[in-house]
Amino acid sequence: MPEPTPERDRVCYFLGAGFSSAFDLPNTTVLLTRVHALARKHSMPLERHLKDAYKFFYPEESASFIPEVVDFFSVLRAYEEVGKGVPGAFEHPALLTDLKMAIARILCEEVRETQLPAGGWKTVGEIIRKGNVIVTTNWDLMVEFYAKHMSVPMRLGWEPNEEYLSVIKLHGSVDWSLKKELRTGASEYVALRQLQNTPRAYSLPIVNEEVVRIQALENMNRNWQLIKAHTTRPHMIVMSQGKSVEMEPIRPMWTGAYSALSRARELQIVGYSIPPDDIEIRALLRAGVARGPEPAQVVVHNPDPSVHMRVRTYVQQSARSEYRPFTVR
């Protein structure tokens, strides 16, 4: 017999880059520009390596050309799979790793510098609260940082519980690492699903864990330094077409997201543009909200009318629209 359809009793939020942008974090379109600025400021070889990559992968473009972010990540990821080590290939094989590290540094430093009021913000508090479920594609630590600041009990992954916030990160995080990528001597890391922001946090075994969380949140003053010292490569799934290989180590996050969306009576999509080529997210959202005889009510928060059209095309025709951008207040 098939399993019974679960009751829709949860409030879920799907957060995209527009949510983080409300805190002045960089969105997807400006990431490469920000990486160039970081590299120039610190005289990093990454600046030259990126320009070499643009010339190699986009030979017809001008010297000032900076590619579209998703396309560039797709090219680099494909190169890692098929071109690495081939004679005459691109001369900086570690570029994707270096790029992830630079982005992690930018996001860590900017979250750390965010000034949170003692009482928080009403609009953010409606999202980051006990009993809610957050599903996000964002790599940054803003949700976790705010939850810690407001002492909101939180767990990464999905378990139905009114006593804590569930946060499901579909693209990984700046503070996650494959265990095999941990540096020798690394010690400050825990299981992803370990409960956070509680008086008594019980340590969970990590023997069978493929991905772990570096304890950057517990050390915000040196969050980036801790990540750099603990992993050779943060587990951040790049924005590219065909993410299935990178998704596999965090498959429980994806299955958990489906379970959570299947339980959602209301799904608020905040700051996510649902690009047509993001097939995995489209399929996940559609499957989750449509499961069972009573679909979830979808509400879209985005100033761009084309986003609302895509949600109605790909996710739910009856989705409600809020055209005001998300703001912290």
Model-predicted segments: where are they?
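Conserved catalytic-core helix/loop/strand module for nucleotide-ribose chemistry
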Residues: 2-266, 272-329
